[in-house]
């Protein structure tokens, strides 16, 4: 019996390049990906095929699908409705496929709230100017619709922290490399490759042992000094500052490179060392508890 697949949300502002990235991901058979064909009330663009790119339906048909609970999610966007057919997704998951949901942020929020077995990835544009350029490059939108899409993007981008991963789409090649590694790390593939995260952890361990032993010793000493009750003292005695530092730095270097970096450098020692130097200023060495991430920089 095949293992059940996973729902993989790849979401982000309109025009960020979801279709181009997904198209490239689908060429890698080891990823076991199946594209979920969405239902929409909008008119087909040139070259789009019904049942392949979208299920193009009337507003009445879409409304009936909502009433009959036939959609996993649905959303209205710039005058049109979009939704994900439940039956199609469930059939593919039971076949062992990982189903890509290429959906708008409103729809992704519904799935994250209501469904299980979901991996979520937010695709980010490098800049708003680049996003505008990509939308205009389609040559399918009026100026008013372009403005509406950009206005919506400004409201959607702050929601990126609700997703498991944030990936910048500065180029399709770089974004695909990042997402492929995420899927390997999350054990969604049949590939024998190991995630680059595993090698990253080894690099971080070496750098920490070479440069930050003094910091680790002082961190542990500070935590013990500030422990004022029995529970806090036990926690301080059990605290492994070296292990915690390696975990924080590895996760943050990986996260930051996915969001704003060249993924080909993720296992480059000089690159990792540079990232760690900046992160070390943000470690609170008077406390075991750290910020959940170092966003905002």
Swiss-Prot record:
Residues 5-184 form the Guanylate kinase-like domain. Gene3D superfamilies: Guanylate Kinase phosphate binding domain (3.30.63.10), P-loop containing nucleotide triphosphate hydrolases (3.40.50.300). It comes from the Bacteria. CDD domains: GMPK. It catalyses: GMP + ATP = GDP + ADP. Its main location: cytoplasm. PROSITE patterns: GUANYLATE_KINASE_1, GUANYLATE_KINASE_2. Keywords: ATP-binding, Cytoplasm, Kinase, Nucleotide-binding, Transferase. Its EC number is 2.7.4.8. One of its GO terms (cellular component) is cytosol. It is an enzyme of class 2 (transferase). It is found in: Cytoplasm. Pfam families: Guanylate_kin (PF00625). Residues 205-297 are annotated as: Unknown. One of its GO terms (molecular function) is guanylate kinase activity. ATP binds at residues 12-19. The keyword ATP-binding applies. HAMAP family: Guanylate_kinase. Essential for recycling GMP and indirectly, cGMP. Belongs to the guanylate kinase family. This is Guanylate kinase. It comes from Mesoplasma florum (strain ATCC 33453 / NBRC 100688 / NCTC 11704 / L1) (Acholeplasma florum). The gene is gmk.
């Amino acid at each position: 019996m095949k293992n059940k697949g996973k729902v993989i949300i790849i979401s982000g502002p309109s025009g960020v390049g979801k279709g181009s990235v997904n198209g490239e991901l689908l060429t890698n058979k080891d990823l076991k990906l199946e594209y979920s064909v969405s239902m929409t009330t909008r008119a087909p663009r040139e070259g789009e095929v019904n049942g392949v790119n979208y299920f193009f339906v009337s507003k009445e048909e879409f409304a009936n699908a909502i009433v009959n609970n036939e959609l996993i999610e649905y959303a209205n966007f710039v005058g049109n409705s979009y939704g994900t057919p439940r039956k199609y997704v469930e059939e593919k998951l039971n076949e062992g496929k990982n189903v890509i949901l290429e959906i708008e942020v409103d729809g992704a929020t519904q799935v994250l709230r209501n469904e299980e077995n979901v991996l979520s990835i937010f695709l980010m544009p490098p800049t708003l100017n680049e996003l505008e350029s990509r939308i205009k490059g389609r040559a399918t939108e009026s100026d008013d619709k372009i403005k509406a899409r950009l206005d919506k993007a400004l409201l959607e981008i702050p929601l990126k922290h609700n997703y498991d991963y944030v990936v910048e789409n500065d180029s399709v090649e770089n974004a695909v490399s990042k997402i492929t590694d995420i899927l390997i790390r999350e054990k969604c593939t049949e590939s024998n490759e190991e995630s680059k995260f595993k090698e990253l952890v080894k690099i971080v361990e070496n750098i920490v042992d070479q440069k930050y032993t003094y910091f680790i010793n002082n961190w542990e000493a500070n935590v013990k000094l500030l422990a004022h009750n029995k529970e806090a003292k036990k926690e301080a005695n059990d605290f492994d500052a070296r292990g915690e530092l390696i975990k924080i730095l590895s996760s943050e270097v990986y996260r930051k490179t996915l969001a704003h970096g060249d993924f080909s450098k993720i296992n480059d020692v000089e690159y990792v060392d540079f990232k760690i130097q900046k992160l070390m200023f943000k470690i609170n060495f008077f406390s075991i508890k750290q910020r959940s991430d170092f966003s905002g920089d």
